Amino acid sequence: MIQFSILIPTFNNLDYLKLAIKSIKENSIYNHEIILHINDGSDGTLEYAKKEKLIYTYSKDNIGLCSAINKAATKVSTKYVLYLHDDMYLCKNWDEFLKNEIEILDDDLFYLSGTNYEIRDIDNKYNPGVSPEKFNPHLFHEFCTNKKEKDLQGSHWAPHIVSKRLWDIVGGFSEEFNPGDGSDPDFCMKLWINNVRI
């Protein structure tokens, strides 16, 4: 059985976080490890994590995305690290697609990412609801089932997954990029330097 450690940094965004975690639990084929880093958490996130028995790290103040992810990564116990935003919702069977791709590869020097759709006016625009309360999972699942995307090379969208071994080799996210701007392309550059071509 394959299992991922899903790292989610969060900063007082509880309603979205709950929806993201619901999507992991309801739309995954496999049972994954969910690890939060809670920045501040004064909106009830800390109590929610305790009640749900989630694995988490915590900082009283917002330490920035890169530091938050790196702290959460200290709790990883699986072979794969997946980075997810706290306001994302995963398609049904999302993990099966990643598992199938990973099994094709000859080694663990890879970086795989998903396709990110947003309600804003970008190339990948789609609106299944503008808030957690208005989100329509049935509409979203229909979209995921019918939308066909080409595989992209060179994308650095979250969610993305690497092996834990590779994460450790490159040292996770570079904390000089806190609060987080530029951290994704920097992470990809560190992977490139370490011979990652997929």
Give names to the regions the model predicted.
Residues 3-5, 33, 186:
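Cell-envelope/extracellular polymer assembly enzymes that use nucleotide-activated donors
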Residues 22-31:
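Short, acidic, metal-binding catalytic loop of nucleotide-sugar glycosyltransferases
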Residues 30, 38-46:
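A conserved acidic beta->alpha catalytic loop
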Residues 59-76:
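Glycine-rich, basic loop-to-helix element that forms the pyrophosphate-binding segment
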Residues 66, 140-165:
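A recurrent flexible, glycine/aromatic-enriched loop bordering the glycosyltransferase active site
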Residues 81:
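Short aromatic/hydrophobic "clamp" motif used to bind/position activated sugar donors
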Residues 92-131:
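Conserved donor NDP-sugar-binding/catalytic core segment of glycosyltransferases
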Residues 153-171, 176-198:
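A short, conserved alpha-helix in the catalytic core of glycosyltransferases
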